[in-house]
């Protein structure tokens, strides 16, 4: 995560802070619903540690847990559960009470992956194009109903709605044929194209709405092909990605050797991959900014906004924008969404960048 400031240029206003986070997802996003919970899962999550919405909430300054508290304090705002398909969510939204702070809250809606998992139960092994297209269209209709209900009846104005991932890339479907994987991947691509069109329609027809669309489809592709760039390991067996539970590891402890894997079980990411999902989303909705620069005697004061809490940062700089190496001018602990840092002023002109390297610590 990187923010830029060119010395002497205009500074930027900070985005208004959100007041709450409400989540409507499937098993990947749940913090309270794991029918297989036990020693190999972190509380009632379907992973070995915190899930992405918890990390995002922390980065947004909306609450975080200590390591000793396995129960997320904001779980009452999390309406996610395993196998919550979009049709279920249409009904569940009706039972969701309108929040008093709806206009300033963030709403996460991510159930399109669940729809494809459901299709693998209801449609697969058929590759009838009409059947799959009808399923996609029904999911899109459901998502439109979800958006409009949240907007009109619940007062939501800011939504996070990620693209669907290629579910054939998860270990659950390692054994299906390459031809079938290609067919289903194309159906996901078709859905995502129509999904983006749907979100654009909502943006143009619902005044004041903002919808962020994290591209988790491309992210999963990139993580699988270059896991090391994200601090992860793509564990393989016979050329297929495997999860911690089905791998050759004998130590399945929550903070053990499997923490660097991409998948914790056959469907769900590890907590470390969850943190990557959160980082990508945080950059999209609240890009870190330098909002003001004050020249002092011997130093420059940089005021920062949208600092991702829990992800420590660096101020790096150089005297020529195009030439030379970036050097570290200061380090800081990200403890608040708005912070100030002082850097030495050792020349007539400096160009600064904010850098937040990918990092993760259990849980």
Task: Provide a role label for each language-model segment.
Residues 286-363:
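Short, composition-biased motifs enriched in small/polar/acidic residues
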Residues 1-289:
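Conserved active-site regions of diverse hydrolases
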């Amino acid at each position: 995560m990187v923010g830029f400031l060119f010395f002497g240029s205009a500074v930027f206003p900070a985005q208004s802070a959100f007041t709450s986070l409400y989540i409507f997802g499937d098993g990947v996003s749940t913090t309270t619903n794991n029918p297989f919970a036990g020693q190999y899962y972190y509380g009632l999550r379907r992973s070995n540690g915190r899930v992405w919405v918890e990390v995002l909430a922390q980065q947004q300054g909306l609450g975080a847990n200590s390591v000793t508290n396995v129960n997320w304090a904001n779980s009452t705002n999390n309406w996610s559960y395993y196998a919550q398909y979009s049709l279920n969510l249409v009904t569940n939204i009706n039972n969701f009470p309108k929040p008093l702070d709806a206009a300033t809250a963030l709403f996460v809606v991510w159930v399109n992956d669940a729809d494809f998992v459901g299709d693998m139960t209801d449609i697969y092994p058929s590759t009838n194009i009409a059947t799959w297209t009808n399923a996609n269209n029904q999911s899109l209709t459901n998502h439109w109903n979800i958006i409009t209900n949240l907007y009109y009846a619940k007062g939501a104005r800011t939504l996070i709605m990620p693209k669907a991932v290629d579910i054939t890339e998860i270990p659950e479907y390692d054994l299906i044929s390459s031809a079938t994987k290609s067919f289903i991947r194309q159906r996901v691509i078709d859905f995502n194209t129509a999904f983006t069109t749907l979100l654009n329609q909502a943006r143009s027809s619902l005044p004041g709405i903002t919808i962020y669309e994290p591209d988790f489809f491309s992210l999963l592709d990139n993580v699988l092909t270059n896991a090391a760039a994200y601090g992860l390991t793509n564990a393989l067996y016979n050329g297929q990605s495997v999860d911690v539970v089905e791998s050759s590891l004998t130590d399945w402890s929550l903070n053990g050797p499997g923490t660097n894997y991409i998948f914790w079980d056959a469907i769900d990411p590890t907590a470390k991959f969850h943190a990557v999902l959160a980082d990508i989303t945080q950059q999209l909705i609240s890009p870190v900014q330098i909002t003001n620069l004050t020249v002092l005697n011997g130093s420059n004061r940089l005021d920062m906004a949208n600092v991702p809490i829990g992800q420590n940062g660096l101020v790096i700089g150089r005297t020529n924008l195009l030439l030379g190496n970036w050097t570290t001018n200061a380090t800081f602990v990200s403890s608040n969404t708005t912070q100030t840092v002082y850097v030495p002023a050792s020349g007539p002109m400096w160009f600064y960048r904010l850098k937040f390297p990918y990092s993760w610590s259990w849980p």
